[in-house]
Each structure stands twice: as C-alpha cells, then as structure tokens.
C-alpha cells in the first residue's frame, strides 16, 4: 500500500499529463513508438532473451537482423512489438479474456503455434522455479474470475487493482509460455485505459524489485510491494512524458547536477526516489535542463 503523499503526487502528475495528452495527441503516439524498443527489450530480457537494446532497435527500427541471433528471439521482439502496436491502434474500453487470448496469439505466432492464443488445459502443467502454476483444469475459470473481479471493482485504488491483477495473473500462469510478457503488456493496457503512460519494468532491477514483489504475493497473497513498485515506475513514466512534452532541452542528471553545483550522488538518489522529475532513457537518468524547485534541497544529502 502506498502512502497519501505518493497518491497525491500521482494524482497531480496524472492530471497534468492528461491535459497535455489532449493537447498533443499525435505527439503522444510518437512518444509511445519511440519508447517501443525499450519496452520490448526490457520485457523480453526479464525472460532471459539475449537480445540487447541495440539488437532490439536494429530489428524493430532498422529491420536489420544479425545471423548469430536465434530465430525465436527475433520473433519474440517482433511479436511483442506487434502486440503493443495493436493496442495502440485498437484502444479497448476494458480488459477481456478474448483480448488476452488475442494478444497471446500475436506474441507466440511462429514461436509456439500449438499453444498460441489458448490457455493451458488437460495435462499442461507449468513450473517457474519452485512455483507451480494453477491446475490446468481450473485455469479457464480462474481467468474469467480474475477479469470479472478487475472490471467490476470500482472502489479499490487503481494501482492496487492493477498490481493485484498482475500478481494473480502470474500466480495462475495461464499459458504454457509468454505469461510474463503478456502480464506486463496487460498492466500497460490497464494504465492506458485510465489515460496514463506505460511503465517500463527494468530488467536490471528484476532480482531486487520485481521478482521479490511477485514472491511476496505468492507467500502472503498481498501485492503491496508490487503496488509500490508500480507507483514508483508510474511517477517516472509521468515525469518522462510531461518533460518530453514541455521541456526546452533535456539533459543528463549528471550535467544538471554539475550546472547547479549539486553533488552527483545526491542528485542521483533524488532521481531514484522520484523527488526530482528525472527519468531513465537507455538506462541513463535525464531531466529538464531548466528544472529548478526550491521545495527539495539537494544539498542536504
């Protein structure tokens, strides 16, 4: 569960972003396309794809494919990008089982056609580490229940709902393959339905933040850690979009700190905590070059 200060910050940033999004509809689409390689790279890398960000850009942007890559990984990049683009061009009003199956079919086409677009059934058990997915006999029913619960719950805080959905989806593990990528894709679709930007779960921090949050849910049936992670990533995503839509010049946080006589480690810590409007691009912290805010004294660190 996140505190009220964090909720207020998200609400304020969300309101600002939605106003900008109405004014800059075409820019929003272009920003999403520009962020596509990082979204695809990180989501696939979490599943142990060996493609680098540069490889992913070559495949998606330049249509260049090196011969030393496995064909499966090339399709994984292209198919995930296709699924994201489908959602961009075909906005949905609510999550449905039919949408989930369509996205899965897109994701696994030419990779595992025999299971693409259908839930596990019969004797199709699945294990991830020590976790065993739900009994295949009950997967279909569990998924309809999960979708119905998400769509009908109008009282719970939206990030709590999204985090619970994601954690339970991964706990059920409804597919024979592609569960993590579909789960993260659905999280961003749920945010988009609320007029919010996509989040990027960094591959580099999966062992420190993402996996422990999922493990907590498996052990306690509570998704608080995942809510906190999603809140942090959403704030960063809002900073990214708002800054790109409004800033005259965007520079590395390292340069910003130097220009303002601020200790670099102090500035970096503030960026990580989200107390300055910084965001990552290709793993590097960036910020509006003209940003100044007396509310946060960076020198106190």
Predicted ranges, named:
Residues 1-177, 181-301:
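FIC/Doc superfamily catalytic core
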